[in-house]
Amino acid sequence: MSEVIPSSEYGRLLLENRPLIDVRAPIEFTKGAFGHSINLPLMQDGEREKVGTCYKKRGQEAAIALGHELVKGKVKQQRIDAWLAQLSQHPDSYLYCFRGGLRSKLSQQWIKESGMDIPYIEGGYKAIRSFLINTIEQAPSQSKVLILSGITGSGKTEVIHQRDESVDLEGLANHKGSSFGKNIDPQPSQINFENNLAVALLKHQQQQHNHLLLEDESMLIGRSALPKHFYSAMQQADIIVLDEPLDARLPRLLNDYVEQKLTDYVSGLGEQAGFDAFKAYLAQSLLGIRKRLGGKQHQELQDLVDNALNVQQSQNDTSKHLDWINLLLDIYYDPMYLYQLEKKQDRVIFQGDRQAIHQWLDKHKS
């Protein structure tokens, strides 16, 4: 077994979801990591901070000596046992620290002395992160970017999920992109969003598609920001427009904004707490667009929401939510979409219903 995994292997280990042991401190891991990694630190946050302070004041040798003093005996054995337990479940794991330096080498040595082998990754987290950032920057030159646009509720995300040549940006951001797009689970950190986007793009490139199909998004998907160079490529790309009649859009939005959302909240929090959280989510979502709506229209929508919630709670009937959804489309989402589409009409190369969109995409696959 090789003791060091070279940088030339970064793409492979990410594509195959290689199990990774991250020996950085928890505070480093929380800021950003990789989806198939587990944090089993060599040093905890406080220990790392003490070693860092010592390094600045007294130099490397003193810092290393302090590290050994802090992580010895029972503490050291606990760290080793955690690594060995992970390796017994995933013997094909690699380990990494921040730069592929002393922490990686020391962890590898202690594991080896305990009777098991594990390679560490050259360059560590920092180098893999640079590789992923470069992957995002290069992606628009690897496959032609194609944007799927469509009015709110047209089912763009469903089409994205049905196409092999797509990358689901909203799925990676864990947010549906609108004021009502927040999910019960938190969004990833910005760094993790970018890391996951890069891995998704690597997998897309491996399949050698002619197009990179992306849903039309703002630069911010919730609080996840698309990298500037990548978003700039999206802003210049050709657009295909998905048409969908209002009578098909309304039930889809009722499911997205109300039925599925309430199910998620109740499942996560229990019936009463879930309903209260769902109610707060609707109020907060409306509040997020209050300035654009104006006070009068915001209040009109909030009154309709309150009435729909009362009917839902007393009669177990969600249909009254269609009143405010319909009005929201009429006074806010539809005019905004049509205005934005008009500004980029010169980039639209095809427009049609779902079947026509799929036929067009199939025709232009190669």
From Swiss-Prot:
Annotated GO biological process: tRNA wobble uridine modification
Enzyme class: transferase
PANTHER family: TRNA 2-SELENOURIDINE SYNTHASE
Job description of the protein: Involved in the post-transcriptional modification of the uridine at the wobble position (U34) of tRNA(Lys), tRNA(Glu) and tRNA(Gln). Catalyzes the conversion of 2-thiouridine (S2U-RNA) to 2-selenouridine (Se2U-RNA). Acts in a two-step process involving geranylation of 2-thiouridine (S2U) to S-geranyl-2-thiouridine (geS2U) and subsequent selenation of the latter derivative to 2-selenouridine (Se2U) in the tRNA chain.
Keyword Transferase: yes
SUPFAM superfamilies to which the protein is assigned, alphabetical: P-loop containing nucleoside triphosphate hydrolases, Rhodanese/Cell cycle control phosphatase
Catalysed reactions, semicolon-separated: 5-methylaminomethyl-2-thiouridine(34) in tRNA + selenophosphate + (2E)-geranyl diphosphate + H2O + H(+) = 5-methylaminomethyl-2-selenouridine(34) in tRNA + (2E)-thiogeraniol + phosphate + diphosphate; 5-methylaminomethyl-2-thiouridine(34) in tRNA + (2E)-geranyl diphosphate = 5-methylaminomethyl-S-(2E)-geranyl-thiouridine(34) in tRNA + diphosphate; 5-methylaminomethyl-S-(2E)-geranyl-thiouridine(34) in tRNA + selenophosphate + H(+) = 5-methylaminomethyl-2-(Se-phospho)selenouridine(34) in tRNA + (2E)-thiogeraniol; 5-methylaminomethyl-2-(Se-phospho)selenouridine(34) in tRNA + H2O = 5-methylaminomethyl-2-selenouridine(34) in tRNA + phosphate
EC number: 2.9.1.3
Molecular function, one GO term: tRNA 2-selenouridine synthase activity
Protein name, entry field: tRNA 2-selenouridine synthase
Keywords: Selenium, Transferase
Organism this protein belongs to: Shewanella frigidimarina (strain NCIMB 400)
Self-association and partners: Monomer.
Family designation: Belongs to the SelU family.
Database matches in NCBIfam families: PRK11784.1-2, PRK11784.1-3, tRNA_sel_U_synt
PROSITE patterns assigned: RHODANESE_3 (PS50206)
Gene: selU
Residue span(s) of domain Rhodanese: 14-137
Keyword hit for Transferase: yes
Active site location: 97 (s-selanylcysteine intermediate)
Domain of life of the source: Bacteria
